[in-house]
Amino acid sequence: MPKTAPDPAADVLVLGEHPAAYLTAVLLKQKTKLRVVHSTIPEEQNPDRLVVINPGFFTLHPLLEPLRRKLDLTPVYGLQFLSDDPSVRSEYRSKSILAHVGSYKQVRAEMAKLAAAQDVECETPKELHIHRLDETGVDATVGRNQLRPTVLVVGGALPDKQHRMLGLPDAWENDVVHRYTFVRLSGTRWADLGSRPVMPMSLNLKDTFCWAWLLPGPKGMQLAVEQPAESLGKFRPADLLAHWVDVLRRNQVLGPKPEVPLDEAESIDLPLAGALAHEGVANRTLLVGPAGGFYSACTEDIYPNCWSALYAADAIKKALKEPHLQDALHPYRHKWRTTLGDYLRGPQQNLRFLLPLVYRNPVMTTRLTESILLGKSVVR
């Protein structure tokens, strides 16, 4: 097959299907003359699931505000902290919405529409290759197109060979990677959480300090457990999920019927607060979203990952005007570390000390709820 003639040089090539990647492309293109190309990464796998969305997501940028009406969302008014012992529990319920629950797939689809509406060139190639890079740009093949972008934005996992070529950080450490195991439940017959639901969760499932949730969604629910990857040899995700079902039943949140389809559970590995361990800057490349490890320690996905897009777009716009682009990309990390960096940390570091207080001190129950759902500091 004859090679396609190279396209005119692109300014930025954004890779990855995560909403953060689409948002980066949107912000780079808006009100500029930059040529911005967005490409999904072949074989990138991000299973659809329910995700908790901080209301702050919609105020990150004016272009995101309309999504509040377009997305099918379930409001959450607080958290209900359950334990293995039904007599030990606490709850904080706010008068206002503290979080939303929606479909990851729908958020991604709306962000893709937003990118197309902003004239981002969107590609879904069967093949993607980064061939080489030098002091003026990067040679890449996106489907049938040969591109030479000045800078790359990576928002998803690349093959190892291309990973090394770009000088991307080494694989995440085991203490950063957490296994998130979930099962979707269709319909609302599983539990009645009322018209102003609080979200049931465990902070210490089976005395493992693993977290678990029952997420109320627009058309169903989702059971989920999270554990450090280094604990997989000791605690099987399927066993933790089954134990969580038992805890919910003993706390009379779930009824004895119908049977939960645990055999349909799916798992993904998330680098929680991984951004704190890496620079997020490689050769002519910035990392955003999952590639940069911008999940919060509380497993929050959409808001913190998309927040990274704002800093990346701003850094790239400034760097493209400088004679030495690589040097101009490095302020990226310094920009987000004192704001988004604090948000990513979450309350986990002090959880062993906080846990007894959560069940007997209403002030601490409130603060931990706001820390998990809104990113506020527990210590004030």
Regions found by a protein language model. Name each.
Residues 13-17, 26-49:
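Glycine-rich FAD pyrophosphate-binding loop
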Residues 93-113, 232-238:
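Short beta-strand to alpha-helix junction loop
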Residues 317-380:
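C-terminal helical "tail/cap" subdomain of flavin- and related membrane-associated enzymes
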Residues 231-311, 324:
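FAD/FMN-dependent oxidoreductases across multiple families
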Residues 114-251:
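Predominantly flavin-linked oxidoreductase catalytic cores and closely associated redox partners
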Residues 42-82:
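N-terminal FAD cofactor-binding segment of flavoenzymes
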